[in-house]
Amino acid sequence: ARICFKNNLPFQFLWMSQQAIEKYIKCILIFNRFPVKNIGHNLVAGIKKINDIPYIKLDLSDKSIYFIEYLNDQGPNRYFQKVMYTNGFEIITLDRTVWELRRYCRLLNYQLKTPKGELIDMLEVELRKIEHSRNVPPHKYKITDGYLEKRLKDNKYNHGNILTWKNLYFGKTKKNTIKIGRS
């Protein structure tokens, strides 16, 4: 999606953005042992299903919620069956939405066994990690052994550069501003 945006391919950008967000939504459901059947490409239905998980209070900004609804409408329009529109700043909102969803892409409700055989519930610890992530600069949030973190580190296939291009939420350093030209 990021490459499509960079190369001024708005139709493809929207479709790939929709696909990316769909994968994050389904990842959250799978990690939390909830079925992903009957969602298809419907992002709003996926978010509804996540909100049905009793211990998850999905903390998404209004901009991300709006963007998910926008992608739900525009993303599947890859065959140009209806009017497509963009405002030119979708890359920023995609990055924000990915960052907000990605924090939940982990096993949350599990137990660890101590050497003494005691079981420790980790749900509260994991939920606190998610809550705490809002209090640190976004670029400092890392998923241990995460795919994006690996690509940022090794820059294999130039992925690190693609991931960090005009990305306020992911990278090695904090970005306060970015410039986006509009055509």
Task: Write out the residue ranges for each language-model feature.
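Contiguous, well-ordered alpha-helical segments that form the cores/surfaces of helical PPI scaffolds
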Residues: 19, 27-28
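Residue-level marker of positions within ordered structural domains that often coincide
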Residues: 6, 25, 82
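Charged alpha-helical initiation segments
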Residues: 1-14, 28, 32-35
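Long, charged low-complexity segments
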Residues: 29, 33-182
